[in-house]
């Protein structure tokens, strides 16, 4: 059985980490490279960087950050945010990113998934899906969850997998930020429908939530931000607890 993965997520704006980070020993809480090193040391399996800046300079800034992170850590990392072309991906992968995450651009142009998978291989194509329940249906949303689409989560996930995505990063917007646990029912259904790894996101509040995402949600990986950034959960302790609960992890 493949080990389950724990993935801290960092929001990046203009080359800096945003959304509050509370590491006492940090010289500069806004430095994504320093944070990446700490998480890598603490036992994170992978990292995700989501670029939320919208400046003209963003690509250059992002490339510089990716290069610096790649020099400092030896765990895989994914970069997402504003990626909409083969050229965007080429630049990021050439500068050291292991994977890219696409979201809105995949919905607007599904062929992009095929193109990226064909050119770079499925293993580096992550499709992020943000969804929330409306009248009992899981509906895909865009623009950080502000814009609803006509797409059903499960139909879209199947299409994404068929087009060559290597992984799906599913964020439940109903759970995101609540610290009440992941959307395990939806996660389990996704795992049944597609045979690519599912990364659970949205709702982590305590260690039990991670246990549940793997055991009930059948997730392959679990992603979180604030519980790690604010030291509410230490990755080493989390992994030891997961192992005690019969979840295979790399210690």
From Swiss-Prot:
Pfam families: His_biosynth
Known catalytic reactions: 5-[(5-phospho-1-deoxy-D-ribulos-1-ylimino)methylamino]-1-(5-phospho-beta-D-ribosyl)imidazole-4-carboxamide + L-glutamine = D-erythro-1-(imidazol-4-yl)glycerol 3-phosphate + 5-amino-1-(5-phospho-beta-D-ribosyl)imidazole-4-carboxamide + L-glutamate + H(+)
GO cellular component entries: cytoplasm
Subcellular location as annotated: Cytoplasm
GO-annotated biological processes: L-histidine biosynthetic process
Record's keyword terms, sorted: Amino-acid biosynthesis, Cytoplasm, Histidine biosynthesis, Lyase
Pathway: Amino-acid biosynthesis; L-histidine biosynthesis; L-histidine from 5-phospho-alpha-D-ribose 1-diphosphate: step 5/9
EC supergroup of this enzyme: lyase
SUPFAM superfamilies reported for this sequence: Ribulose-phoshate binding barrel
Superkingdom as given in the UniProt entry: Bacteria
Location of the active site: 11, 130
Documented EC number(s): 4.3.2.10
GO terms, molecular function: imidazoleglycerol-phosphate synthase activity; lyase activity
Reported function: IGPS catalyzes the conversion of PRFAR and glutamine to IGP, AICAR and glutamate. The HisF subunit catalyzes the cyclization activity that produces IGP and AICAR from PRFAR using the ammonia provided by the HisH subunit.
Subunit field text: Heterodimer of HisH and HisF.
Family: Belongs to the HisA/HisF family.
Cited HAMAP family: HisF (MF_01013)
Protein name per the record: Imidazole glycerol phosphate synthase subunit HisF
Species this protein is from: Flavobacterium johnsoniae (strain ATCC 17061 / DSM 2064 / JCM 8514 / BCRC 14874 / CCUG 350202 / NBRC 14942 / NCIMB 11054 / UW101) (Cytophaga johnsonae)
């Amino acid at each position: 059985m493949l080990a389950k993965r724990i993935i801290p997520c960092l929001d990046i704006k203009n080359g800096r980490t945003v959304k509050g980070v509370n590491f006492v020993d940090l010289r500069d809480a806004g430095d994504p490279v320093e944070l990446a090193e700490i998480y890598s040391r603490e036992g994170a399996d992978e990292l995700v960087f989501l670029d939320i800046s919208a400046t003209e300079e963003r690509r250059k800034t992002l490339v510089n950050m990716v290069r610096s992170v790649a020099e400092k850590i030896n765990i895989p990392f994914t970069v997402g945010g504003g990626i909409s072309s083969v050229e965007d991906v080429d630049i990021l992968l050439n500068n050291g990113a292991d994977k890219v995450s696409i979201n809105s651009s995949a919905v607007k142009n599904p062929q992009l998934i095929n193109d990226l998978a064909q050119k770079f291989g499925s293993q580096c194509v992550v499709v992020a899906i943000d969804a929330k329940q409306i009248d009992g249906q899981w509906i895909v949303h865009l623009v950080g969850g502000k814009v609803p689409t006509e797409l059903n989560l499960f139909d879209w996930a199947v299409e994404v997998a068929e087009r060559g995505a290597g992984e799906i990063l599913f964020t439940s917007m109903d759970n995101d930020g609540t610290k009440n646990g992941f959307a395990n029912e939806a996660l389990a259904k996704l795992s049944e429908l597609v045979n690519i790894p599912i990364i659970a996101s949205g709702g982590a509040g305590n260690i039990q939530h991670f246990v549940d995402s793997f055991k009930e949600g059948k997730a392959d990986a679990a992603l979180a931000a604030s519980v790690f950034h604010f030291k509410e959960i230490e990755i080493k302790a989390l992994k030891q607890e997961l192992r005690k609960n019969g979840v295979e992890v790399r210690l």
